[in-house]
Each structure stands twice: as structure tokens, then as C-alpha cells.
């Protein structure tokens, strides 16, 4: 990833004007609206950090949560912190800025991290679906299959594939000539706005990028769907109502996160976006990049007794230390 920190301006110097920065319009409005948005996103960011940080701390400190399911959940919370950090801090700076400018290299760095972390999230959701499938459909074999070592390999696989998939296509996109307007009507550097500003068409690069993104979305979503079909079939065969409720409580929260994330991502990157208003595109991007990390702690702890107890112990322990 180190080559992303060098000058990423296009190699084609024949153009009369080379873009050295982009203007992110974000959410335009009067000063009062900007202050409201700044306060709103700052609160969302702090709550996201606190909520997901609490999950990480609870999983790390509570021996009862040292299981594959909570190990994956802790890593997922860590991922959510990085994912939301790829967008909101720059949004906050952009809201207060008069120029709304982001450097050329900074724009493509954000582009890289945003898509790499998004891909990692897709893979994590698939791995978590696999974990729930094994736990409910094959409970006897689960401890032998989902060992700590195997779980660590799955987590490493998600991070490696997520971050090794986009350096080359994004590097080639950064080498396209950007010699005209530099205004991006978005709050982040995304594929469609950047390609619209390029002075030369790049159908092959664009095709490779979208094919790669679509394949990740398709295969992970199909795997999750298959896992839940098998899982729900097994749940409905459980004779006791209490057993069915327990099974639903362990997988229901994951299903909510999957639906929220994939539903908005597919509207943005699988269906054509040229007919979608710009404001709606921004809102959809906010849902899967900001709202999902915010509600992740609430969704995963709402019906999970072990996690609620662990978080309660964390808060209780903090109060004791403050009073002592």
C-alpha cells in the first residue's frame, strides 16, 4: 500500500491543466445547516467509536466471550471503526472548510480504503454466516471445525483479500488524465464521480473495477443466502419453541445487518445509478457506510444476553474505577 503515498497525479502531462485537487460538495446548504450536519456526524462518529469499542473491550476482557462467534464479532466491530473512519473525519473537515478541497492523493487514498474496507466487510459477513450455520446446523462438529486457529485464518483471509483486491485497478484509475472540472457532487471520492471527471474514457479499467465489485457482492450475498436457507430449515425442525427462539436470536441480528448493508450497496453498485438523484445516492451511501457501523453494536447486543451482560460488567467496572 505504500505506493499510494507517492504523487498519484496522471502521467499524461500533455494536457493544458492538470488537476491537483478535487472539490467535494458534500451536503450543500446555509451555515446553520452545515453546523447542524457537523454536529450530527460528530455525534454519530463518537457513538460509533464508543459502541464498537465497547464490543471489542468486552470480547477481549470477558473469558465467557472467548469463542469463535464473539471473536468474529470483535473483529467486525474493529472493522466498522475503520470503515466509518474512512468517511466521517474527512466529512467533518469538509463541512468546516471554505474551499471543500481534497488533494489528488488524498482523494484516491480515501477511494482505496473505502472500497477495501467495504470488500472486507462483505467477506466478514459471509464468514459470520458460515459460523452461525455451523453452530446451528452442525453443533457437534462445530468445536472441531471452528477452532481458534481456523477462525484466525478466516479473519486474516478477509483482511488480505479485502486490501489486496483494489490497489492495481485504483492505481490505474489514478493515472487517467484529469484535466477538466474537478468538482465532485458527493461527500467522498467514489467511482462514478471520478470517472465522470476523467478526460479520457477507460472502459476496460472501469469494466474490471465493476466486475470485481459485482463478483464480491454476488458470491458473498449468495453464500449468505444459502447459509440462511439451510439454517432456517434446521431451525424450523427444532421441536421446542424455546430452542427456536434461541436459534433465531443468535442469527437474527446478523441477518438485520446483512439486509441493511447489502440492500443499499446493491442499489448503488449493481443497479444502474444514472437514474438515481444525486441526493439519494448520497443518502444510500450514508446508510451502508455510516448507519450500519452506528447500529451494529445495538443490533448485536439487543437480543444477546451474553453480550449485554459483558457490556454491563464493562460499564460497572469503569464506574468502580472512577469512584475508587
UniProtKB/Swiss-Prot annotation:
Disulfide bond annotation, renumbered to this chain: 107-199
Main subcellular location of this protein, as a coarse class: membrane
UniProt GO MF annotations: G protein-coupled receptor activity; olfactory receptor activity
Membrane spanning stretches: 36-56, 65-85, 110-130, 150-170, 208-227, 248-268, 282-302
Entry's localization field: Cell membrane
Keyword annotations from UniProtKB, A to Z: Cell membrane, Disulfide bond, G-protein coupled receptor, Glycoprotein, Membrane, Olfaction, Receptor, Sensory transduction, Transducer, Transmembrane, Transmembrane helix
Bilayer topology: Multi-pass membrane protein
Cytoplasmic side: 57-64, 131-149, 228-247, 303-324
One Gene Ontology term, aspect cellular component: plasma membrane
InterPro entries (alphabetical): GPCR_Rhodpsn (IPR000276), GPCR_Rhodpsn_7TM (IPR017452), Olfact_rcpt (IPR000725), Olfactory_GPCR1 (IPR050939)
Family: Belongs to the G-protein coupled receptor 1 family.
UniProt-recorded name of the protein: Olfactory receptor 11H4
Amino acid at each position: 500500500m505504500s505506493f499510494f503515498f507517492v504523487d498519484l497525479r496522471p502521467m499524461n502531462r500533455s494536457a493544458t491543466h492538470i488537476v491537483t485537487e478535487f472539490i467535494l460538495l458534500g451536503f450543500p446548504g446555509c451555515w446553520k445547516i452545515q453546523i447542524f450536519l457537523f454536529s450530527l456526524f460528530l455525534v454519530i462518529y463518537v457513538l460509533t467509536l464508543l459502541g464498537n469499542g465497547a464490543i471489542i473491550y468486552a470480547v477481549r476482557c470477558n473469558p465467557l466471550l472467548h469463542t469463535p462467534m464473539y471473536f468474529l464479532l470483535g473483529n467486525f466491530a474493529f472493522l466498522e471503526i475503520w470503515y466509518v473512519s474512512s468517511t466521517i473525519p474527512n466529512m467533518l473537515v469538509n463541512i468546516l472548510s471554505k474551499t471543500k478541497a481534497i488533494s489528488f492523493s488524498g482523494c484516491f487514498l480515501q477511494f482505496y480504503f473505502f472500497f477495501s474496507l467495504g470488500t472486507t466487510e462483505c467477506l466478514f459477513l459471509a464468514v459470520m454466516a458460515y459460523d452461525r450455520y455451523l453452530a446451528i446446523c452442525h453443533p457437534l462438529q462445530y468445536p472441531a471445525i471452528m477452532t481458534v486457529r481456523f477462525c484466525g485464518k478466516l479473519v486474516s483471509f478477509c483482511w488480505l483479500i479485502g486490501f489486496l483486491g483494489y490497489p492495481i485497478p485504483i492505481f490505474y484509475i489514478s493515472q487517467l488524465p484529469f484535466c477538466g472540472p474537478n468538482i465532485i457532487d458527493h461527500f467522498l471520492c467514489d467511482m462514478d464521480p471520478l470517472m465522470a471527471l476523467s478526460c479520457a474514457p477507460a472502459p476496460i479499467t472501469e469494466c474490471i473495477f465493476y466486475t470485481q465489485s459485482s463478483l464480491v457482492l454476488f458470491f458473498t450475498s449468495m453464500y449468505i443466502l444459502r447459509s440462511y436457507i439451510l439454517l432456517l430449515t434446521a431451525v424450523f425442525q427444532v421441536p421446542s419453541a424455546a430452542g427456536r427462539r434461541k436459534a433465531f436470536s443468535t442469527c437474527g441480528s446478523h441477518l438485520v445487518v446483512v439486509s441493511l448493508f447489502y440492500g443499499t450497496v446493491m442499489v448503488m453498485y449493481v443497479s444502474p445509478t444514472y437514474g438515481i438523484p444525486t441526493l439519494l445516492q448520497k443518502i444510500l451511501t450514508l446508510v451502508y457506510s455510516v448507519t450500519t457501523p452506528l447500529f451494529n453494536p445495538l443490533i448485536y447486543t439487543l437480543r444477546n444476553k451474553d453480550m449485554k451482560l459483558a457490556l454491563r460488567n464493562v460499564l460497572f467496572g469503569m464506574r468502580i474505577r472512577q469512584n475508587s
